[in-house]
Curated annotation (Swiss-Prot):
The lineage of its organism: Bacteria, Bacillati, Bacillota, Clostridia, Eubacteriales. GO terms for biological process: translation. Keywords: Ribonucleoprotein, Ribosomal protein. It holds the Pfam family Ribosomal_L30. NCBIfam families: rpmD_bact. Belongs to the universal ribosomal protein uL30 family. One of its GO terms (cellular component) is cytosolic large ribosomal subunit. This is Large ribosomal subunit protein uL30.
Length: 59
């Protein structure tokens, strides 16, 4: 599996509760926090849901 580098680039303030929960499930709690999960279908679905808040790169 490929690894992804996901960075939160926009604030979670004022977002829908399920979008905040999705970001927290990915481990993204603060702006500019970065995580490197495996590119599983579950993670890709979470990214698609909140892609307007993220910067995603393949590692």
């Amino acid at each position: 599996m490929a690894k992804l580098r996901i960075t939160l680039v926009k604030s979670l303030i004022g977002r829908k509760k399920d979008h905040i929960a999705t970001a927290n499930a990915l481990g993204l709690t603060k702006i500019r926090k970065t995580v490197e999960p495996e590119a599983t279908p579950q993670v890709q679905g979470m990214i698609k849901k909140i892609e307007y808040l993220l910067k995603v790169e393949e590692v």
